[in-house]
Swiss-Prot record:
Enzyme Commission identifier(s): 5.2.1.8
Protein name, per record: Trigger factor
Listed SUPFAM superfamilies: FKBP-like (SSF54534), Triger factor/SurA peptide-binding domain-like (SSF109998), Trigger factor ribosome-binding domain (SSF102735)
Originating gene: tig
Any one Gene Ontology BP term: protein transport
Organism field: Borreliella afzelii (strain PKo) (Borrelia afzelii)
Gene Ontology MF terms in the entry: peptidyl-prolyl cis-trans isomerase activity; protein folding chaperone; ribosome binding
Major place of residence: cytoplasm
InterPro entries registered for this protein in UniProt: PPIase_dom_sf (IPR046357), Trig_fac (IPR005215), Trigger_fac_C (IPR008880), Trigger_fac_C_sf (IPR037041), Trigger_fac_ribosome-bd_bac (IPR008881), Trigger_fac_ribosome-bd_sf (IPR036611), Trigger_fact/SurA_dom_sf (IPR027304)
Comment text on domains: Consists of 3 domains; the N-terminus binds the ribosome, the middle domain has PPIase activity, while the C-terminus has intrinsic chaperone activity on its own.
Amino acid sequence: MILSKDIRLLPGSKVEAVIRVSKNIIQEKYNSLLQDYSSRLKIQGFRIGKVPISIIEKKYSEGLRATVLEEVINNSLKEFFKEEPKRPLSYASPTIKEENLRLNLDKDFEFTFVYETYPEFKVPNIDDIDIKVEVPEVFIDDSDIDNEIKSLQIENSIIIEDEEGVVKKDSIVKVDFVELDDLLNEIVSTKRQDFVFTVGKSETYYDFDRDVIGMRINEERVIEKSYITDYKFEELAGSLKKLKIKIKSIKKRDLPLIDDEFAKDISERYNTLDDLKNFIRSKILSLVEEKKEALKLNKFFSTISEKLEIDIPRSMIEAEIEIAFKDAKRQNKMSLEEFKSMFYSSGYNGSDSLKDEILSNLKSKLIIQKMVDLDPIKVTENDLKDEMVRQSENSGVSYEEIKKFYEDQNLIFYLKDDIKRKIVEKKILASLKEVKGKQVSFKDFVNYKICE
């Protein structure tokens, strides 16, 4: 169908293509559609199939041309992308540049469209990479094991009424609260009922955990809260608020005893409390190794990305912003548009920490995917089976069920890609030179502060 095409690369990893379609193709499709109309059209005064072509054209020419135009463009795009190696991004549709396109049956038809494609860049050979990574020495003591045991104790506790009826640290309380104006009138839009939280554990929006300690059921109290200028919620930062709070219920956790029976209740695999502690220790050691690998990979990607200029298309950035927004919206109340505004406020290359983090994550994803695509290794059927067996052992779901899931959902391709990604990551890790760092506690290590 395509008579000729001109392709031009634009900034932002965009492709501009000019497509020309022969007038003969246009005329053929137009005449075919005209004949189809003629055979089916019903017009008063004429039998079906006997309406003169001239009358059909006079009455329906614009509609016929519009139909042919749409078909020609759609078929041209299909043909173009079937042969063109620079594919469009799945979340960015091609855009036709011309407005009010019209067909002239006596001339070849030409139209221009623009689309965003995967950015082109080169990654260095792993064997040529010389990167040193300082990895801290992590020490694990009994308190780390005890903390995990305490978490399991809380998870397996029962919530019961607190007969003392007084709010204290760790009480589970249900409250009604509302903001008050200067005249102590309720600001209805801020009213919240049956809000449940654990005193001293939950980070409430208004941060009134400590203010309810000592209150009793059905007690009502008006408090004043002053918020620092860099308070975690911007809309409250630097403000003074009056709040009316009413306690509706006070409960507590009935914690099980930590003994051999407790361990058995956690899982049949544990016969004693020591069995449970040994399992937790092994899990902590595995977690430390995973975090160390993540630290090394972060160092690798940050070092490589600093040396690479990647012309990232806007739609790819938009998709990454939405991912970051979903993670961030749990901690703030801003809309997606407000979040995007923060990102774009000073352009792509500003020094804003949010922007730097999002672009850095995106560049890392692009680099690893490029390395996966270029790596010649093939994922075998045995590799697939081994991964499914591993998932079966970790999840408790049978191998047959996992295999059926991947096949039914057409996810085998993605599983292969994930397996290959892990193989490439192992190659990267093997290429890095580890330097012994300072000694840190397990708690400090897992909070990722040392990984910044």
